[in-house]
Structure formats: structure tokens, C-alpha cells
Curated annotation (Swiss-Prot):
This is Beta-galactosidase 3. One of its GO terms (molecular function) is beta-galactosidase activity. Residues 1-31 form the signal peptide. It is found in: Secreted, Extracellular space, Apoplast. Belongs to the glycosyl hydrolase 35 family. It catalyses: Hydrolysis of terminal non-reducing beta-D-galactose residues in beta-D-galactosides. One of its GO terms (cellular component) is apoplast. Residues 760-846 form the SUEL-type lectin domain.
Amino acid sequence: MREMGTGDSASRLILWFCLGFLILGVGFVQCGVTYDRKALLINGQRRILFSGSIHYPRSTPDMWEDLIQKAKDGGIDVIETYVFWNLHEPSPGKYDFEGRNDLVRFVKTIHKAGLYAHLRIGPYVCAEWNFGGFPVWLKYVPGISFRTDNEPFKRAMKGFTERIVELMKSENLFESQGGPIILSQIENEYGRQGQLLGAEGHNYMTWAAKMAIATETGVPWVMCKEDDAPDPVINTCNGFYCDSFAPNKPYKPLIWTEAWSGWFTEFGGPMHHRPVQDLAFGVARFIQKGGSFVNYYMYHGGTNFGRTAGGPFVTTSYDYDAPIDEYGLIRQPKYGHLKELHRAIKMCEKALVSADPVVTSIGNKQQAHVYSAESGDCSAFLANYDTESAARVLFNNVHYNLPPWSISILPDCRNAVFNTAKVGVQTSQMEMLPTDTKNFQWESYLEDLSSLDDSSTFTTHGLLEQINVTRDTSDYLWYMTSVDIGDSESFLHGGELPTLIIQSTGHAVHIFVNGQLSGSAFGTRQNRRFTYQGKINLHSGTNRIALLSVAVGLPNVGGHFESWNTGILGPVALHGLSQGKMDLSWQKWTYQVGLKGEAMNLAFPTNTPSIGWMDASLTVQKPQPLTWHKTYFDAPEGNEPLALDMEGMGKGQIWVNGESIGRYWTAFATGDCSHCSYTGTYKPNKCQTGCGQPTQRWYHVPRAWLKPSQNLLVIFEELGGNPSTVSLVKRSVSGVCAEVSEYHPNIKNWQIESYGKGQTFHRPKVHLKCSPGQAIASIKFASFGTPLGTCGSYQQGECHAATSYAILERKCVGKARCAVTISNSNFGKDPCPNVLKRLTVEAVCAPETSVSTWRP
């Protein structure tokens, strides 16, 4: 074991200082947060900490307490959040900290739960958030250049950072004041951007660090993905794996600020899933190397309400395949397996923070990391890096079986209490179920294209960049011009129609010719620039061409935000006329920001004039583009999370009682959904689902936004969907599965005082649990033996205990939860001696009121 060095001495001095004051009867002493090369020290004590990202504006305030408590119950110590500048300062000097923007309330809720907080001020956040969290008005500060050594930008950034720090200080929220905030972050993932900028980037990064330190928060600052972070700022890692990361100084701890629990979804793409076996493997690899702080990005992803989604093309759902899903429900097995991982690692904490690992080879692709402390504490991590084969290894004269791509954790260097690949918790099957809400009665309002040239428009020569015109007050900008066609044009006499070609910098465009939709075109997140090319039907005389350019979230990654373009910058040209090509780019164009319905505030309950609304049955017969639909509904009974099923619609936006649910788009997902394995390096395209289906079909409707009755639902449809297909559904657990082997690791089999001695073997159990208000209605599958398949498609194998169904029905049906011990005696006899068996179960969950309590 290596000597701990000066960092260890410093931590002991801090600890003795604190204890000395307590012994002298001085009372409570706040010793603050410091660090050494092993870990963060809180009040002088080194800590292994697990953190979870929960972004306050991506859920509603009434959800915060439950989300944070679920995180705590899952073994989380710290809640991490970005701070979103564009929410808090929507216009220069005017601040908003109300509702979902109530940062103080969120941090106090963390404190109330007894957890710590990590405040990532940025103020650049990325986060798949509109404009990376920057307010768009910042783009128009004279002389500004983003994220570089630029005085206007630094002045604005300093002002906002200091405003947030002072707000936290005024509420005593830093740990140095007795609050929960133990870490703060300045900038975000700047390393690559700084390299591109050279000296200016380095100067800016150094300035940002000094500016942050000068705020005197009393807690450490971090910079993620910034190898040159100057002392005392800690540089940290983001990624799917961080076991190869090392801080830039030997006296700084290994901190993983973003352990990606999944990945975000983009319109037109599939959903991404990261197997929990691989996520647990990545975390265990980081800890076995000496890591002491892991933050799951995300632990609860939530929803991109309103127009907050960035990308562009990032979906309204920001579920992220996180342990707590978009709706605030626990995602199993990810939540439970990580909870067991946290518990196992915390058993090793004394050894982990007191020693350095001794690494030895125990096979061709297997290693042991052993932590032996002077106190006698010993913990070991046995790793199998082979992606194909399990390994049987010898460690401390004991054999251990390691599945492929897995790590076993031995808190006492003897008993394996956890293996990253052996999932013993249940899998919960989630479904969207009908509610008792009656069929919606719709009214519709058509955008009047003939009234676009009113006082809200302006005319100029040439094509203008979209955000410079809209200032991001709307997704929509009209580009309108006229084309005169002579009687002699050949296409008027049976010839080929002319072709309109439009080059756009993003993100979508709808083409109207003389008031009729002629075509649409869309970019993608990878290629936001696109070209539209289509035949158009013109008549003799003056023809009106109206192009509705649509933004689908502003980009959130990169530098020089001031230079980014959106909208139609051309060229725009007609081909196939008698004169050949007619370039329309530099003629007069008339512009209108937003839609008429937006100007009329049609989405708000107090602004829904009856003039212009018609019975939707008239529009359903022939769906029209650019149509507003409204209806009223009563809140469904119960407390299950709610969503709108938008499968029959096209693209647009949704509001409930004036609150924006967000953008919807039922674009079909393309990708490869054919294969998924937990083994091997994870990438977002590895485990995908939803190919050939709408990228996002369901849209979260927070219950906090509903009244008991007469809730106003407004939909703006760009393409012409059918509102009669829209329905309100509830998210609930429909069934649970579990599969546990005879010798599954059991934490009960570990007691530190029995190290090296024989002990009673505690047999593993299958645990099944439905959601609150539910009970197990039936057993769909049960087999103790060698069953085959996966959850939802199990089959009996060659070995099967005939009593399996009867045992599970007797112990579980009619109950909200049950546990069944995996033993031969429990099932009458050994169905296949000398064969490793497992108990596999699939159960159906239903409301308690509908489940009979009778059991055979």
C-alpha cells in the first residue's frame, strides 16, 4: 500500500480541528467542504458520494419532493442541477425565479430531504436546452463573442454568476453557511472549444475560474471536460465511462460529473437505452480505480416543456432512460440495480477513502483491485473485461464466478455481495392505459393566410436570418413575396410546371402558393441545412408565395453562438420559366413573426374568442394545415401520471390551461433496433427501440396544471392531423418480471465481524412489487428451473418445477408485493440435481379494487 502523503495529513488536521472544538464544548462547528486526492471532505471526513441530475424546470414544483425522496431512497447523496440563464433572465435585468424557475425552493427541497446539492451555474449548460441555456438577447449585445476572451460576454457572464451566488448566499444555501450546496461548477465542457480558440480560449477559461473563486462560496468549484482547469478548481470527467480519467493535479480527487445513464432522443430517431448492467459496470470500474464522486446524468430527465428543447430537433421528452422516468415513476430494473450497487460500494467506503488499490491479474482479461486500510478494513473489486465469456477466478484462495463484462464487489475481501451483471431486482412493464375522460369535443380555427399583410408585417429587400427577426419569441417566421407570370408561359398551356428551389439553414419549411400548401421540407439534427425542390402550380398574373420557416429548438453545442444562423437564407429560385431561372432571393420580401393564433393568445383560457372557431367535424373531413384545435376536459380520477396520445397528429405545439406542454412531432423513427447486449463498450446506437414508430407518441400532462373540470386543451397543428384521434392516457405498471439464480449475491451474507469465518447462507429471493394502489392480479409465468427468454416472452426450459405456478399464486396473488425464497424445499424437491437453477416470474398488476383476494 502506498503512503497517503500530504493530502492525508491535511485531512487529519481538519478533522482534529473540528473535533477539538466539539470536545471543548464550543458547539456546532461548520468545517466546510475541502478535498484531497482521495475524495471530497465534508466536515473533515472523506466521502464516497453518489449524485443524480434532476433539472428543476424539467418537472413541476409539486413533483420535486417526490423525485428527490426517490433519489434518496435509491442511494443518492447529492442532487445536481444546471442553472438556466435564459429562464431566469428572459430580458436584460429582469429576473424570474417563480414556478418551475424557483431555484431557491428546489435547493431547499434538497436540503429538507437531507441531501447535498451540486449547483452547476455554467452559465453555459448545453443540456440539449434551447441555445445552450443562454438568453437569446445576449446575442445582440454590441461587440459580443460567446465563450471567449471577450469583455461584453465576460461582463454579462460575471453579472449572472454573481447574481446566482448572491441569491444562494442570501438564503444560506452553501454548505459553508449550513446549507446543502457542496460543489459549484463554472463553464461546461469547454476543453475542446478552448483548444479551437487557442490563447483566447485559455485566457477566458482562466478568467472564468478566477471570477468564480472570487465569489467566495466556501465550497469547491469544478470544471468538467477541461484539462487545464487552474488550481484550486477541480477538473472532472463526463462520459459513458471515466475509468481512464485522471485529474490534472495529483492532489485533486476523481470526480465524474456526468455518468450518462442513457441518451437523449431526437425527432425522427429511435429511443436509446443503456443496459443497467453496463452502467453499473462503468460506475464500478470508476470506483475501483479510485473515483469517489459519481453523478448520474440523468437520474430523472423530465420534460422539455414549452420551447425549451434545443438540439435542434431534441424531443419534448427528456426521459434519458434514467432511473426515474419522465413521469416521475421508478424505472426497474435500472433504479433497483443501481440502489444495490450504491449500497455495496458504501460498504467499502472506509477502505476506499483510506488506501490506494493494489492491482493484480487474476486471469487473461481479469483483474483484482484490493483496498487494504491500516484500520484493517479490506475491500476488493474483481473485474472480468471479457465481452464474450464468463470467468472462474481464484482470489484469496476462494473461487468466484464472474459473468462477461462485470465486476463483483467484496466489501470484506471475501464475500461477493454484488455483481454488476447479475440483476436481481424486478423489471417493471409500463403501459399507457385509457382514462375515464370522455371523448373530446373539438372546435377548430384556421390560420387566415389572406390577412398576413397587416400592421404586424414589414417589408425589405432580400432574405433575413430568422432569429434576428423573431428574437426567438416564436418558432415561426413568414417569408412572403410575389411572382408575376405572363400569359405566354408554356406551363400554362400544358407544359411542365416550374420548380421552386429553396435553400434553408434550418429547421423546417412549409410552402404555400396562393394560399394552398404546396409542400414541406425538414432538416435533421445532423443536417439542419436542407434544400426543398418541388413543382408549384402558378397562374397567370400575380402569384403569392408564402414560406413558413419553422425552428425546432436552437442549437445547444459549440461556441460563437452569436454567429449561428436559422431560417431561409437562400438562394430561393424558380426554374423552368421561359426566361429560365428567376432568382427570388433579392426581391422584396414581407415578414411576419409568429402566427395569427399566437398573436390572439388562442392557447390561453382568458383569450379564446368564439369568433372564427368552428365545429372540428368540418375540418376532420379534410384536414387542413395550420389549424388550431381546442377542447375542454375534466381531470381523470386517480393520481397516475397523465399524457396525451398524439399518434394521429402531425407536428405542432400543445397547451393545457395556457401552460405549454411543448412541441409535438410524430415523425417516424429510423435506425437499427435489431440488437442489444450489455457487454462491450456502449454507444447510443447500440441499444435502440421504436424503429418504424413515432419518435414520441405520448406527451406528459402534469396533474398540477389541471383543475377538477373544464381544462382547456389547445393544439396547433402544422400539417393537418386529425384531432379526433387524440386521447388522454395514464401511465402505470401493467406487469412485473423477475429472474434470480440460486446463488445470486446477497448483502445479508456479509458481516464484517465474520470475516474469514463460516457463516449462515442466506438464500436469495425473488421480490415482486406493483405500483401503489395496485395488487398482483395473476401469475402469467413461473418456473423454477432453467427457463428461457426475456420479460414478456418467457418459456419453460428442460428443467421445470411443476409446483412453480401454484407456489407463486399462493404467495403473491392479491398482494401489493411478495417475496419468494429460491430453494429446492420451497418447490417440493430439486427438479434437476446438479444444475444451477433460477426462479423466473412474470406477474400481472391491476388496481387493488379489481383484484380478488382469494388465493388457492
